[in-house]
Amino acid sequence: MTRAAPAGARLRAARPWRGRSPAARLALACCLLLVVLTVLVVTRATQAVDQSVLDRLRPFDAWGEAQVGWSPWMDRLRPEHMYLLLGAVALGASLWRGSWWPAVLAVVLAGVSAGLALALKAAVHRTDPHGFVTDSGGAFPSGHTVALVVCLGGCLLVLRPRVRWWLWLLVPAAGALLTTSLLVAGAHWLTDVLGGALLGVALLAVGSRLRVRRLAHGVGGPTRRAGAAGP
């Protein structure tokens, strides 16, 4: 005779969505939205909206004062700079704490984000607003956006065991700056940026729950400073 499952377990089984952590819910929601958006992009259902935004922000494909003023931010916030920032912050945290786990966390976040972004770009193979397919494989999702969201958010995950809500405002603030520069310059479609943001947020939500993050903050395992070897 089998024992009946506790009431709490039965409730979680019946309502799996409610049994998940907020981070898991956020990751799942972003993944579902990304799948829907990808299908819409592939079927060109978003093309009219994308073209309307492009025509409004860069009419007649002209290069004017707005483009001159905003376009430098694309270079300042490009993926290489973002990944270098995350690497520098993680290396500093590793040296300060005497453990390589912060660096491992950064490598995981950077590697997975870059790999997934490139894979999705190659799968969708979308042209940019000027009709070209970039060397990275395509315009969707925006690699600039993925790198910015993951790396700025990753710095917070590396530095703080518990990130206060107002610190997260740094990510959308920088994201708004990058988005404006990408769209005004005509470097990306609007849905490219949205796709990059969804992928980046999903990866951050997952990364916040990884065991390697707990280890990076000395929770769940010894550090070198405590006399144990790192990874």
Locate predicted features.
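N-terminal transmembrane-helix/juxtamembrane module of multi-pass inner/ER membrane proteins
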Residues: M1-M82, K121-F132
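Structural signal for the C-terminal ends of transmembrane alpha-helices
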Residues: T2-R18, L91-W100, C155-R162, V206-V212
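Hydrophobic, membrane-inserted alpha-helices
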Residues: R12-A13, Q67, L84-G92, V150-G154, ...
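Interfacial segments of alpha-helical transmembrane regions
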Residues: R20-C31, L86-S113
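Aromatic-anchored segments of alpha-helical transmembrane domains
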Residues: V35-T38, G111-A119, A173-G186
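Alpha-helical transmembrane segments of polytopic integral membrane proteins
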Residues: D50, S113-A117, L152
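Hydrophobic alpha-helical transmembrane segments of integral membrane proteins
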Residues: V104-V133
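Membrane-embedded catalytic cores of phosphoryl/pyrophosphoryl-handling enzymes
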Residues: G131-P231
